[in-house]
Design a protein with these regions (language model features):
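Short, acidic/polar
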Residues: 20-29, 75-83
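Canonical Radical SAM [4Fe-4S] cluster-binding loop centered on the CxxxCxxC motif
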Residues: 1-22
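Radical SAM/AdoMet-radical enzyme domain recognition
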Residues: 38-39, 52-140
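Glycine-rich tight-turn/loop motif centered on a GG-T
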Residues: 10-17, 48-53, 104-116, 146, ...
Length: 190
């Protein structure tokens, strides 16, 4: 439950868990748009409804359509990342959001995402599982001192490169924009 996110659990918006048929229909629709080979599968942080078995099946269904499969899901256990690799996943994207631990807990007051150490150590679990490609990022605008977050991410990346040197890395710089409905406002606008 992220206080800044429009998808947070208390937002009364309709949510859908796609059936296998709907998943395949989405894949076909994407392929009709252009000859895409890269696919990023994204889920909410709900392991009961969109956990590892669901993600594994979605990966299996994607293989006939796409050659490069990445996921952006809740942080997983090492063995879960390894299992998803067996289903064709070759990359993971995870946003730490902020490295400021005290504020992290304010922005993520409950749920699995509220566990700072579990999230930040997820990158190690990806490396231990031999994930081919890891994408990481902080949410610029969440903290007033955004340069500190970027510096901490750079140190974290350097650590990962030393320990899991076989892995390829990418860095993402998503930024917050002002909310039009008067909700959470960024501390910095870039």
């Amino acid at each position: 439950s992220c206080v800044y996110c429009g998808f947070h659990i208390s937002n009364p918006m309709p949510r859908t868990i796609l059936t296998e048929e709907e998943i395949v229909n989405e894949y076909k629709a994407i392929k009709k748009l252009a000859p895409f080979e890269n696919l990023l599968l994204v889920t909410g942080e709900n392991p009961a409804k969109a956990g590892v078995p669901y993600i594994a099946r979605a990966l299996d269904l994607a293989k006939p359509y796409f050659s490069n499969l990445k996921i952006e899901v809740m942080p997983l256990k090492t063995e879960e990342y390894a299992e998803l690799k067996e289903h064709g996943m070759n990359g993971v994207i995870c946003f730490q959001e902020t490295y400021h631990k005290a504020n992290y807990n304010i922005y993520h007051p409950r749920g699995m995402k509220s566990k700072f150490e579990w999230r930040v150590n997820g990158f190690d679990r990806m490396g231990q599982a031999g994930v081919h490609s890891i994408g990481m990022g902080v949410l610029i605008g969440l903290e007033k001192e955004w340069r500190t977050d970027i510096t901490m991410m750079a140190y974290h990346l350097r650590y990962l490169q030393k320990h899991y040197w076989q892995t390829k890395y990418s860095v993402n710089f998503p930024r917050m924009r002002p909310s039009e409905n008067g909700g959470f406002q960024p501390n910095v606008i870039m």
